[in-house]
A protein has these predicted regions:
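RNA-contacting regions in translation and RNA-metabolism proteins
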Residues: 1-281
Length: 281
């Protein structure tokens, strides 16, 4: 019955793979390394906060397992900090989390006079600051939940501003088009923003650069046309960073293609050679 509750306990013993904690009643609690935020660091005698993830009952010897990486821990911290959630005026609809890095949380208000995002963040961030500190500076985006999936995807990709979306609801996939300067915001550092948006909305999100109105479409060639010469997974890796045309690749910095699309230098050089040859003919 303690599963899902937040516990503060004293660090009693530190091992390589887990930490042993003792609560006020002398109960032994385990915080495995896999349930710790990557930057967590504790010393003996310090207090740690975590949520009860499960109780392992082996040989009639129950072990209480704690977690700091669970979305439930983030949810409970918001419930403690935001009275409107505790009172049932605001509900947390969805959480997506990459522990210690970034999280997105979708909230909804049952009282139209209450702004759910503002209530969760607090005046000058007063409510969210404590949660961010507890989670080792995990960046938390709070967004308004909506059952309109297209609008939800748009909000989930913030701070990027979306130009248009083509939905493929049968495949749970969305093609998102953005202005060139918004693409890197949508993807986020290390791809975190788009990954969390996908987790939150449960949709595969493909990001594309919107071709400007002055771009002459027939002068450029979509990457899909090169499937005979370039492996499909390579094309998909490039499209995932918002570039879907040959000129888009040729105009992009080589380092960006290597780093953002996570491709080998040789692979990028081969692609550039193939695409250049197309325009030199």
């Amino acid at each position: 019955d303690r599963v899902g509750t937040v516990i503060s306990a004293e660090v009693y013993q530190i091992w390589k793979k887990e930490i042993l904690l003792l609560d006020d009643e002398g109960n032994e609690l385990l915080l495995p390394k896999t349930e710790q935020i990557p930057s967590d660091f504790y010393r003996k005698g310090e207090t740690a906060r975590a949520v009860v993830a499960r109780v392992d009952n082996k040989n009639n010897n129950p072990k209480i397992i704690l977690s700091r990486t669970s979305p439930v821990f983030l949810q409970r911290l918001f419930e403690q900090e935001v009275p409107e959630i505790n009172d049932g005026l605001i509900t947390i609809k969805k959480i997506a989390r990459i522990p210690g890095e970034r999280a997105k949380i979708a909230v909804e208000s049952y009282d139209e006079r209450i702004d759910p995002v503002g209530a969760c963040v607090g005046v000058k961030g007063s409510r969210i600051h404590g949660i961010v500190r507890e989670l080792r500076n995990e960046n938390i985006d709070v967004i308004n939940y909506t059952s309109n999936i297209q609008l939800f995807i748009q909000r989930a990709l913030s701070p990027a501003k979306v130009s248009s979306i083509i939905m493929h609801e049968d495949e749970k996939r969305a093609e998102v088009y953005l202005k060139p300067e918004e693409v890197s915001l949508a993807i986020g550092k290390g791809g975190l923003n788009i990954k969390l948006a996908s987790m939150l909305t449960e949709y595969t999100i493909d990001v594309y650069r919107e071709l400007g109105e002055d771009a002459v479409a027939d002068e450029d060639i979509y990457l899909d046309e090169f499937k005979d010469e370039i492996d499909e997974w390579v094309i998909n890796a490039i499209k995932a960073i918002g570039i879907d045309t040959a000129k888009g690749v040729l105009n992009a910095p080589r380092e960006m293609l290597i780093e953002k699309a996570d491709l080998e230098e040789n692979t990028v050089d081969d692609i550039l050679r193939i695409l250049k040859a197309e325009f030199e003919e």
